[in-house]
Amino acid sequence: RWVPEVYDRLPSEGALILCDSIADAVTGAEWIQESTPERLEIKQVALAEIQESCVVEAIVASSTSGFMPSELQAGSARPEQLLVAHPYNPVYLLPIVEVVPSAVVPEETVQRAESLLTDIGMKPITLRAEIPAHVGDRLLEAVWREALWLIKDGVATTEQIDDLMTHGFGLRWAQKGLFETYRTAGGEAGMKHFLEQFGPCLQWPWTKLTDVPDLDDALIDRIVEQSDAQAAGRSVSELEEERDANLVAMLKALRQEDTAAGAFLNRLGRPLTNLAKHQE
């Protein structure tokens, strides 16, 4: 119900069709999105079954958050048809999607994938090389790992860490990202000055880097207890409703300023109507 508040123009509503088999679902489809559980053997079986029934021209994309396309393509009859298109939840409000082809995927297929994604209101970011966990989840993993250490070492609570993000740098990141935030911090001299001034800090032992805390029962219990207290009795559905309302408000504000995700959404009124050409 939030989507109409974000997009100016939407195509006419379609119909959700439930199928009894993968073959029925993919026959004649132009785009097929695989979203099975994050286990390589399950995905490979599903992808093989998809390719048995889909047309050769179809794009078969995986939502995998961790596997590289070359891993998914192992044993595939048509590996050049498979790529990764990794979105972020809630998919209906966050426009970004990581497109990850392997070396065997033709450039024409990549360009067609980018075009189709743009036509449905997504912002495709095509990575220059495949890597486990792509880009977004690697950044999130680094922050998550450090947060677990801060809780394990008794430095901060889950609520304090979330407050630091929601009341601080998270607000900057939502509109400027990481590098442009630091470029601004460098003053009129820009990024070069920032790197010269703060670059040496990278040598300081501030973080745990790649060390992973042991998620033993004690740490799990501590996180769960603090998170439950932070939720204050609100259900997951209530938290999701609050999240979506906040995202819509933020996207509207970014649209008004014509920046970041808002600038992208401002250009989407016309492209979204292009869905009709894919439904002919």
Feature locations, PLM:
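Rossmann-like NAD(P)-binding element
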Residues: 2-59, 67
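Short acidic alpha-helix initiation/capping motifs at coil-to-helix transition points
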Residues: 138-143
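Rossmann-fold dinucleotide-binding core
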Residues: 59-129, 133-137
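NAD(P)-dependent Rossmann-like dehydrogenase/reductase catalytic/cofactor-binding core
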Residues: 122, 126, 153-280
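A general structural motif at alpha-helix termini
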Residues: 11, 76, 165-168
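Short, flexible helix-loop junctions that flank or precede catalytic/ligand sites
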Residues: 50, 130, 149, 163, ...
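C-terminal regulatory/interaction module of P-loop NTP-utilizing enzymes
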Residues: 118, 144, 148-157
